[in-house]
Amino acid sequence: MRQAPGFTKTPLLGRLPRQISGGQRQRVAIGRAIVRSPRIFLFDEPLSNLDAQLRDEMRGEIKRLHRDIATTMIYVTHDQIEAMTLADRIVLMRDGLIEQEGAPLELFERPATTFVAGFLGSPKMTFLPGKLSRTAAGASIVLDGDGPRLDLPPGRIADRAAEGMSLILGVRPEHIYRADGMAGAPGEARLQAAIELLQPTGSRTYATFRIGGTPVTAELEAHDAGRPGETITLGINLNRVSLFDAATQRAI
């Protein structure tokens, strides 16, 4: 009890299992495992039956527990927020096979496949299909569906990638921003797009646009998000995008 104060509450001790909720049973089960002081923990979606607020609290408790007792924990989850916030290393699997293994930030910033890129992050990464174009000035990607040509920063794509190769450009909402009246920056692409939908969340607003026929989500400042139907100038930080081979769905 001393070791797991967040997982087993004193008012529950006198009750039978049938007298407590599913979420309370999960918390008691975690507490019972902790006080046994095992050499390794295996958690299989331990927070799945908890409501959102309690799930947030228990994530913090598990994080503190891991820090305090320094015991290896294997934590199975379908929740990418739990994976990112709790893990020292993530093993991301698909259909029983490992897609990528590494530190959370490594998987988030350098995803090995489109599956990894789309699984981590909320709102999820947008995928824009296009073709590689090479000129004496450098490489660019021409987006499908009458989309724009985006000039890639030097060294951003491998030399082995051939002219006309089908690519997928992955861009996260936080790397798209409103650029009206702003000076251009190295590695930045600019384009005009009309706001289709706004989803305010407080300090930030998620705006939906279409680029080359594909819906794209941008994370904008709430006070400067605009209004639906308004056409604004978007900036895309091409230094932070991911590029994938369309045929293999793997990063290049």
What are these regions (language model features)?
Residues 1-115, 119:
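ABC ATPase nucleotide-binding domains
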Residues 81, 105, 114, 126, ...:
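Glycine-centered loop/turn positions within well-structured domains
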Residues 95, 129, 241:
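Conserved coupling/switch loops of ABC nucleotide-binding domains, chiefly the family-specific signature
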Residues 110-132, 170, 237:
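C-terminal boundary and immediately downstream tail of ABC-type ATPase nucleotide-binding domains
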Residues 126-134, 189-196:
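Structural detector for short beta-strands of small beta-barrel domains
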Residues 136-138, 198-203:
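Short, conserved beta-turn/loop elements at beta-strand boundaries and strand-helix junctions
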Residues 139-140, 144-196, 215, 224-252:
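Glycine/charge-rich catalytic "coupling/switch" loops of P-loop NTPases
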